[in-house]
Amino acid sequence: MGTWEKMYEEARAIYNPHEVSDFVYANHVVAAVEAEDGQIFTGFCMEGTCGVFHLCAERAALFNMYQFSGQTKVKKILAFRDKPPYGEGSGMPCGACREFLLELNAENKEAEFMMNYETRKTIKVAELIPYWWGEERATNWQDK
Protein backbone atom coordinates (compact mmCIF):
# COMPACT_ATOMS: atom_id res chain seq x y z
CA MET A 1 0.00 0.00 0.00
CA GLY A 2 1.39 3.39 -1.00
CA THR A 3 1.54 6.48 1.18
CA TRP A 4 -1.52 8.16 -0.34
CA GLU A 5 -3.58 4.99 0.13
CA LYS A 6 -2.43 4.65 3.73
CA MET A 7 -3.28 8.30 4.40
CA TYR A 8 -6.72 7.85 2.86
CA GLU A 9 -7.46 4.71 4.88
CA GLU A 10 -6.35 6.29 8.17
CA ALA A 11 -8.44 9.42 7.57
CA ARG A 12 -11.44 7.41 6.37
CA ALA A 13 -11.32 5.43 9.62
CA ILE A 14 -12.20 8.59 11.60
CA TYR A 15 -14.88 9.88 9.17
CA ASN A 16 -18.05 9.96 11.26
CA PRO A 17 -20.19 13.08 10.72
CA HIS A 18 -22.30 13.78 13.79
CA GLU A 19 -23.69 16.47 16.05
CA VAL A 20 -21.80 16.95 19.28
CA SER A 21 -24.47 19.25 20.71
CA ASP A 22 -27.19 21.56 19.46
CA PHE A 23 -24.41 23.97 18.50
CA VAL A 24 -21.42 21.88 17.40
CA TYR A 25 -20.94 19.25 14.74
CA ALA A 26 -17.86 17.24 13.94
CA ASN A 27 -16.09 14.73 11.71
CA HIS A 28 -17.71 15.78 8.42
CA VAL A 29 -14.24 16.56 6.99
CA VAL A 30 -11.19 14.45 7.79
CA ALA A 31 -7.52 14.86 6.92
CA ALA A 32 -4.23 13.03 7.06
CA VAL A 33 -0.75 14.54 6.91
CA GLU A 34 2.53 12.78 6.29
CA ALA A 35 5.25 14.26 8.47
CA GLU A 36 8.85 14.64 7.38
CA ASP A 37 9.80 11.32 9.02
CA GLY A 38 6.98 9.43 7.26
CA GLN A 39 4.57 9.20 10.21
CA ILE A 40 0.93 9.83 9.37
CA PHE A 41 -1.30 11.95 11.60
CA THR A 42 -5.04 12.46 11.22
CA GLY A 43 -7.57 15.05 12.30
CA PHE A 44 -11.22 15.95 11.85
CA CYS A 45 -13.08 19.24 11.73
CA MET A 46 -15.33 20.67 14.41
CA GLU A 47 -17.67 23.58 13.77
CA GLY A 48 -19.85 25.70 16.00
CA THR A 49 -22.97 27.56 14.89
CA CYS A 50 -21.94 31.04 16.05
CA GLY A 51 -18.77 31.09 13.96
CA VAL A 52 -16.26 31.72 16.73
CA PHE A 53 -15.28 28.08 16.87
CA HIS A 54 -14.17 26.31 13.75
CA LEU A 55 -11.25 23.94 13.47
CA CYS A 56 -10.52 22.47 10.07
CA ALA A 57 -9.45 18.85 9.72
CA GLU A 58 -6.11 19.87 8.22
CA ARG A 59 -5.18 22.06 11.17
CA ALA A 60 -6.35 19.38 13.61
CA ALA A 61 -4.05 16.86 11.90
CA LEU A 62 -1.18 19.37 12.03
CA PHE A 63 -1.81 20.00 15.75
CA ASN A 64 -1.72 16.24 16.34
CA MET A 65 1.52 15.96 14.37
CA TYR A 66 3.19 18.61 16.48
CA GLN A 67 1.70 17.43 19.77
CA PHE A 68 2.68 13.79 19.34
CA SER A 69 5.97 14.12 17.45
CA GLY A 70 7.24 17.70 17.73
CA GLN A 71 7.55 17.84 13.94
CA THR A 72 6.59 20.88 11.89
CA LYS A 73 7.52 19.81 8.35
CA VAL A 74 4.92 18.13 6.16
CA LYS A 75 5.38 16.12 2.98
CA LYS A 76 1.78 15.31 1.97
CA ILE A 77 -1.75 16.33 2.91
CA LEU A 78 -5.08 14.75 2.05
CA ALA A 79 -8.49 16.09 3.12
CA PHE A 80 -11.99 15.02 2.15
CA ARG A 81 -15.63 14.65 3.14
CA ASP A 82 -17.46 11.48 2.13
CA LYS A 83 -15.13 10.47 -0.71
CA PRO A 84 -11.52 11.10 -1.72
CA PRO A 85 -10.63 14.37 -3.47
CA TYR A 86 -11.94 14.24 -7.04
CA GLY A 87 -10.78 17.55 -8.53
CA GLU A 88 -12.87 20.68 -9.05
CA GLY A 89 -11.65 22.14 -5.77
CA SER A 90 -12.56 19.20 -3.58
CA GLY A 91 -9.98 18.59 -0.91
CA MET A 92 -8.45 22.05 -1.22
CA PRO A 93 -7.50 23.80 2.03
CA CYS A 94 -9.04 27.04 3.20
CA GLY A 95 -6.92 30.16 3.53
CA ALA A 96 -6.41 29.66 7.28
CA CYS A 97 -5.04 26.15 6.72
CA ARG A 98 -2.73 27.33 3.94
CA GLU A 99 -1.45 30.12 6.16
CA PHE A 100 -0.98 27.86 9.18
CA LEU A 101 1.05 25.38 7.14
CA LEU A 102 3.51 28.09 6.16
CA GLU A 103 3.65 29.70 9.59
CA LEU A 104 4.30 26.30 11.17
CA ASN A 105 7.28 25.77 8.87
CA ALA A 106 8.03 27.86 5.77
CA GLU A 107 9.48 24.75 4.11
CA ASN A 108 5.93 23.40 3.98
CA LYS A 109 5.59 25.38 0.75
CA GLU A 110 6.89 22.16 -0.86
CA ALA A 111 4.18 20.00 0.74
CA GLU A 112 1.75 18.39 -1.68
CA PHE A 113 -2.04 18.55 -1.39
CA MET A 114 -3.99 15.77 -3.05
CA MET A 115 -6.33 17.31 -5.63
CA ASN A 116 -7.60 14.17 -7.36
CA TYR A 117 -7.13 10.84 -5.61
CA GLU A 118 -7.94 8.73 -8.66
CA THR A 119 -5.44 10.43 -11.00
CA ARG A 120 -3.00 11.30 -8.17
CA LYS A 121 -2.97 14.95 -9.23
CA THR A 122 -1.38 17.10 -6.52
CA ILE A 123 -0.57 20.75 -5.99
CA LYS A 124 2.15 22.29 -3.83
CA VAL A 125 1.34 24.78 -1.09
CA ALA A 126 3.63 27.28 -2.89
CA GLU A 127 1.22 27.18 -5.84
CA LEU A 128 -1.70 27.94 -3.53
CA ILE A 129 0.10 30.90 -1.90
CA PRO A 130 2.67 32.07 -4.45
CA TYR A 131 3.51 35.38 -2.78
CA TRP A 132 3.37 34.58 0.92
CA TRP A 133 3.70 37.67 3.11
CA GLY A 134 5.87 35.89 5.74
CA GLU A 135 8.72 34.69 3.52
CA GLU A 136 11.29 37.25 4.72
CA ARG A 137 10.41 36.76 8.39
CA ALA A 138 10.59 32.97 8.00
CA THR A 139 13.99 33.23 6.34
CA ASN A 140 15.28 35.36 9.22
CA TRP A 141 13.94 32.77 11.70
CA GLN A 142 15.70 29.94 9.88
CA ASP A 143 18.96 31.90 9.92
CA LYS A 144 18.92 32.16 13.76
Language-model-detected regions and their locations in the chain:
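Hydrophobic "anchor" residues
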Residues: 39-40
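A short glycine/serine-rich beta->alpha loop
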Residues: 43-52, 83-87
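Short connector loops at helix/strand junctions that flank enzyme active sites
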Residues: 26, 56, 72-74
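Short beta-strand scaffold segments in enzyme catalytic cores
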Residues: 25-36
